[in-house]
Amino acid sequence: MFWLKKFVSFWLMPVPLCLTLLIVGIILLCFSKRLRLGRGLLIAGTVLLTLFSNKLVSYALLRPIEATFPPIPEFVAGAPLSPALARCRYVVVLGSGHSDSPGFSANNQLSASALARIVEGIRILRRLPDARLITSGPGEEGFTTHAATLARVATEFGIAPERIILTETGRDTEEESQNVRALVGNAPIALVTTAWHLPRAAGLFRRAGMDVLPCPTDHLARPTKEFHLSDCDWDTNSLERSTAAVRERLGYLWVWLRRKV
């Protein structure tokens, strides 16, 4: 089921979907008599690619997901923590991705989202002296796991190794929630992950029986104070935002259908 989910979701992502429609449309126009269908597929692929790569559309798709939980605000010296955060016994940083690149420091091997997650986790952990850090993420056989790479970054930024727990077998968010549940029981946790991923992640962790404080980071569709004409542009960053929105909605649909959230 895991690989079936990955296969199906890949072909429903904006770029593979649009390219498939365009390529099949061209083939039908050039090598078959189904000209009407070919034109329809070409038009559909072009329209969808235009929409997905537009800033306004991508923001409209992603912002409602990212706005589900507010970010943890900047800490002020001497000011007390919120009761919800102060009671957390663990800070859980979910995996995202890294490259095994010899000669590069651990932080430079992390993907942009993984780096944002571990930095936010460290920021929160430093205000919780009695809490421990849990890093999550598997790795290919013979290579460093993602959890271990995150842990190396944490130690390089001053977190004592004895405060870090690794969970290295979860292939997706559902498995990560089960692994963390086995480690912490129902102890309150601060759950750190990318903002658009957090609604589904928090739902899965709560479904597993955990007391979760959502801590979003790495927002891709931050709200702005003013509207600018450039907000109507088309760019590859918009494709990234649209892809994140589609991926997360498909992921939430998958777990909802399986009654996990």
Located regions from the model:
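Membrane-embedded alpha-helical segments of integral membrane proteins
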Residues: M1-C30
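Hydrophobic alpha-helical segments of integral membrane proteins
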Residues: W3-V8, V57, L61-I65, V246-L253
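Membrane-interface helix-boundary motifs at transmembrane edges
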Residues: C30-G38
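Hydrophobic membrane-insertion alpha-helices, especially the h-region
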Residues: G40-N54
